[in-house]
């Protein structure tokens, strides 16, 4: 489980002054709906003293579209990251119910071609993977193309795979790590070799998968009367803080993806940096972290097994 971040109240006054400033700036902007990413960064406004109630009220009173604009600018400028734990929790409790889901949707729209690293642990065939897999991933959303390398400090080190739906939507090309890495072969994306390592296919490696999963589950949460997360907290993930939202379902699986799910929002970018899920016995069955997420423009060699950088 992710460690709880330590909260300091030392910067509370300055933090809420910044919060009030950003709220005032956002309220003054005229932005077309759905184009928050295109809006100019608002100029700062001086704000006196500790304006905790005022700042939160200003942000929470904005319509959803303006809250998304505000959140986008606060993340990009680093203001969101500079708020302390208590301020972050209070802020996200005050936002409109639809703001979080609409905000992370902007991340899926923006991050369509990117490189990242991921740490993953899963319960596969009833057994928990005690050592995380640490992978470098190069990902293109459309057409779906994925290159993955298992890094030296994680499980299955040295393994590589490439998936290109243009060549074959049902198979991937891979080689194992270690002394067996001389042999490369085609395998079904949901075949036995893949399922021995993961409950997910290569098509489910991107941050968009976890966003889409959250959006689908959110509809089911609300249909079941679960209107808001049971807990909002600030946790640490690989040296970075996340705002973590825990959702608990009345019946669990198979009606829902998990009995309990916790998603950690990145403070700089509009996506979930972490995802954890528990089964009906409240045993953790998967844990994912995404780090070093960087927008890229890939050429065709990135998804070609003949790339001299690779060892196929």
Q: For each of these PLM feature ranges, what is it?
A:
Residues 87-180:
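N-terminal mature ectodomain segment of secretory-pathway/periplasmic proteins
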Residues 36-90:
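Compositionally biased, proline/threonine/alanine/serine-rich low-complexity intrinsically disordered stretches
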Residues 19-30:
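Bacterial N-terminal signal peptides
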Residues 87, 116, 168-213:
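Acidic/charged, solvent-exposed loop-and-adjacent secondary-structure segments enriched in E/D, K/R, S/T
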Residues 41-49, 54-58, 151-153, 162, ...:
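Gly/Pro-enriched, hydrophobic low-complexity segments
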Residues 1-15:
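N-terminal secretory signal peptides that target proteins for export/translocation
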Residues 86-106, 185-193, 215-233, 243-244:
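N-terminal short leaders/motifs
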């Amino acid at each position: 489980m992710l460690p709880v971040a330590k909260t300091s109240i030392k910067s509370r006054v300055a933090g809420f002054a910044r919060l009030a400033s950003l709220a005032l700036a956002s309220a003054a902007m005229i932005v077309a709906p759905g184009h928050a990413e295109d809006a100019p960064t608002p100029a700062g406004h001086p704000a006196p003293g500790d304006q905790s109630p005022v700042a939160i009220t200003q942000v929470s009173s904005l319509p959803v579209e303006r809250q998304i604009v505000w959140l986008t600018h606060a993340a990009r400028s680093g203001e969101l990251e500079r708020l302390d734990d208590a301020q972050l929790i209070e802020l996200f409790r005050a936002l409109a119910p639809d703001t979080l889901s609409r905000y992370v949707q902007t991340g899926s729209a923006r991050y369509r071609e990117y490189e990242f690293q991921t740490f993953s642990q899963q319960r596969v065939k009833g057994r928990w993977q005690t050592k995380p897999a640490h992978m470098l991933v190069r990902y293109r959303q459309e057409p779906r193309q994925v290159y993955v390398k298992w890094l030296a400090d994680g499980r299955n080190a040295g393994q590589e795979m490439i998936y290109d739906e243009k060549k074959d939507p049902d198979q991937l090309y891979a080689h194992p790590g270690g002394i067996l890495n001389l042999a490369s072969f085609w395998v079904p994306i949901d075949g036995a070799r893949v399922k021995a390592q993961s409950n997910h296919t290569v098509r489910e490696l991107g941050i968009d998968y976890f966003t889409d999963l959250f959006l689908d589950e959110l509809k089911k949460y609300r249909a079941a009367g679960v209107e808001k997360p049971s807990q909002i907290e600030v946790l640490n993930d690989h040296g970075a803080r996340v705002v973590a939202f825990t959702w608990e379902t009345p019946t669990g699986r198979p009606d829902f993806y998990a009995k309990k799910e916790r998603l950690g929002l990145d403070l700089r970018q509009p996506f979930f940096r972490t995802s954890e899920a528990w089964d009906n016995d409240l045993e953790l069955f998967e844990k994912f972290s995404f780090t070093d997420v960087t927008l890229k423009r890939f050429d065709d060699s990135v998804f070609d097994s003949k790339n001299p950088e690779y060892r196929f």
